[in-house]
């Protein structure tokens, strides 16, 4: 049986080992060293203890990525409380529901969230703490009020001759099955569930990253945190892995627009990049593809002798756009556009596509860029098993199942959902459909809930149709829905490009109809679109930038 060490002991060891190293920077702001983080953790432990927080109590966090968020999260775990990270992009009503459902005792909030929420809607909370300076937004107990008012005094009394590394001693989880955090799903299917992740899941994800990716990372290497830390993809691979490895994490404390991200890449020059497809696709489509459409470039790319050299030069330029210092870019969280992937593969760009789920904290599949099979999402990750429920897994898609220490304990207060997701043998049923080749590479076809049934009984995977549609002229993104036995394409045009081209609304409509005809010309009869509709606004998305499909299929 696998021996799993204490995760909190790893946090403690990393702090002691890297005491004077830079670890957390708010981009264009403050930088904390490990000893600064340790002091903040200790102060929060004193606050928790003196305000009556018990081991196992729930502490929620909701705010943009920041060093203060990271310290509050680490303090929660190492105190023995259960963290409840909440995506700051959730609506106030969603935040109230999660805080109330999780039985949270305290809530840490960022500056924006603090102005949007109403404490009366969360009656069981004992207090709301302001993340930037840990001041109290709300206190419902005298103990909490007193503890915060006298926090510096109590810290000084406990450590009269300065706080040193020998003082660092954290709560160690009693067993790997102990609950570490509850992470509420992004709500892609319209219903958010509380995923209970044990310490073994945090350890297993961190051990995978340190073992497989960590051999290319050195102490002091830099990483930019782009994804929300309240999402397990960002939490595991842009924060916890790096913190345990002695790396330096930069937080984009503002909304990470493409311009801000591009500037941060140039300034920080990260060693590893974790991204959702949308970020990569926007940079490639806006910064790279237009340069390849000139007559000169088209001519050069069609000359076999020169083609290789041109692709190498293009690869250099694309690599430079991402800082020029990374070992590889790991893409995950949503489907990757095939046109963009084909381009990156052709120029020899160092990328790979992984696969995961909140319920696995998150990793399920991964392959290093050097062994990555194009179009796949890699093989079963370290510590995990993966199988396809299909009579012919190589050719007939079936549900993807996974088993291993990453898998959740269950859904908080939802035994029915837990039984539906985890079978008696411990396999987690992902709800995703895919195939697996002889080498173990997994190819995702779509969500089983999204699969459409054609009039002739043929299975239709809308994600595959959308990938093709989104590569057509002037289409920024798309969703395919079914009305009766008809398929309809909802297309959101690239209005920026249309403006540059001087197109009128009627021109855009004509182009979209032409796209439909061109699409149908190369598709089998059961997958053809009977109509297209223009979606004026961008499709609403989850924080990991996958479209909330359920909003458009009703």
What are these regions (language model features)?
Residues 10, 51, 78-157, 485:
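Structural core segment of the AMP-binding/adenylate-forming
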Residues 10-33, 189:
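AMP-dependent adenylate-forming
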Residues 30, 46-90, 226:
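Conserved AMP-binding/adenylate-forming
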Residues 33-35, 171, 180-206:
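Conserved AMP-binding A3 loop
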Residues 148-184, 191, 216-222:
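Conserved pre-ATP/AMP-binding loop-to-beta segment of ANL
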Residues 203-222, 232-316, 325, 350:
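Conserved AMP-binding/adenylation subdomain of ANL enzymes
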Residues 380, 394-395, 399-454:
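Conserved ATP-binding/catalytic segment of the ANL
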Residues 452, 477, 485, 516-554:
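Conserved C-terminal "lid"/linker of ANL adenylate-forming enzymes
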